[in-house]
Amino acid sequence: MDTSQKTVAVVIPVYKSVNQLANTVSELINTIESSTEFKDLNYKLNKVILVDDGSTDGSNEVISELILNPVITSITLNRNYGQHAAIFAGVLSTNEDVIITMDEDGEHDPLIIPEMIRKIEKDQFEIIYAKFKYKKTDLKELSSVYAKKFIGSISRDPNIKYISSFRAVKGTIFRSAAVYANNGSFLDVALGWISRKVSTVETTKRITQRRSTYSLRGLVNHFSKLFFAAGIKPLIFLFNLGWVVSLGSLIAILIIIYRKVFSSIPVQGWVSNIIVIVFFGGIMISSIGLVARYLSSIVETSSGKPFFTIKNQK
């Protein structure tokens, strides 16, 4: 083998995907092994790591069959820790030059992997995300896009809007992020601690028959974690919002005083009371909730709560 040849590891978190996993892995390996662009870049698929994140549908049995292929290895977590914890568990078992992460349900097209590798190798980027094209009627995906844009704007991190679970990252960058990450960390925010050299490759998310394992509550928790992982900037945003709301309440009160003194429009006394209560009550509740969420993250980290624990590794 060419000693200068670089290696790639693909980490796939697995959760309740008994019907999709085998096809996804087979397509991945066949696509990469038949790619002339991949070979021209002098890269080799060295390892596919399947991380079972507490599946209860028989996915572990499929994994047991797949690991008969020497390229495929597996990690089984003790319970369901979440996608990011599963990915970090896989990343920490790698030593490859580039690490790819993708979903197990077949929505991610492996055909763009050589292009992702090319951007790292030739264009000197360190983090590459798949940029999905969505239909304007896809409310779930569009809400995800706008949520990331909103969080990116208040955290002043322009790269947050690019994040997706289909990514290619230089191995040294990903492993460094995995070492520093903890329960309060959001994977892509952690990557941003290490590198800002981010780019994208455009693709289309494929339609599969699998139902999403994310409930509405799970999606809210997912973006809540991203929001709080953005550091102290949301606190600064809330502080500025408090000033804006206070100014708005002051203007509303001045309007009421003007109408009371200079016009014949009757103003009920309870109107001003409600304005004050709503504005300042809302600010206090938001502030208390925000601070409480930060404190809970600090407590979880300081108490030594594990990010993940491994049951076995093959």
Q: How does the language model describe each region?
A:
Residues 2-5, 19, 189-314:
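Hydrophobic helical membrane-anchoring modules
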Residues 17-21, 55, 109:
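Donor nucleotide-sugar binding loop of glycosyltransferases
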Residues 7-9, 47:
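Cell-envelope/extracellular polymer assembly enzymes that use nucleotide-activated donors
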Residues 52-60, 106-107:
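A conserved acidic beta->alpha catalytic loop
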Residues 17-38:
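Short, well-formed alpha-helical segments that are part of the catalytic scaffolds
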Residues 99:
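Short aromatic/hydrophobic "clamp" motif used to bind/position activated sugar donors
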Residues 37-54, 76:
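Short beta-strand/loop segment that forms part of the nucleotide-sugar
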Residues 77-79, 83-93, 110-185, 206-217, ...:
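Acceptor/aglycone-binding surface of glycosyltransferases and processive sugar-polymer synthases
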